Amino acid sequence: KYNVQCTGFQVDMSISSQVKQFGENIISSHHSIDVLVNNAGVFYPGEILKEEDGKLEAMVNTNLYSAYHLTRKIAPLMVERNKGHIFNICSVASIIAYPNGGSYSISKFALLGFSKVLREELKTTGVKVTSVLPGATWSNSWKGVDLPEERLMQAEDIAKLISNALDLSPSATVEEIVIRPQLGDL
């Protein structure tokens, strides 16, 4: 349906210098970038007062700073063309705190805040910004968890929502997409 070109790179998204170099690599191999999906994320369960030192920093580095640094590299190309769409994959944990999700929720609240500021800053440039806030979605990180796979959403559902948001006219944007499993949050 779409004429899409994708390239793979191996990057530790928690290390800002690697993220910035990744951005440079993308720019040098793709002179025109229409869509950026900031989807790097990590989750370490724990309560704020009981979690190991460094967990907050680890999650903020991956969940927030990777999107921040990559966007700062890629978005200027979009602004130059007055066209583009940035999707930040947040979480329902961006709007609702839950037990044992302390620093993860903090990092995702921050990513949603980043998305809102970015949307405000870019709205007159033709570049759209959409925050995607999914609930529990199946991935390999759920392997071994005592839950039926059917209890989780499928990643394809998130991809379809992103695809649909891309199909809108230039005068319309979806600011936030909240999607949860049919049976509710875990």
Q: Predicted regions: what is each one?
A:
Residues 71, 107:
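Active-site helix of classical SDR
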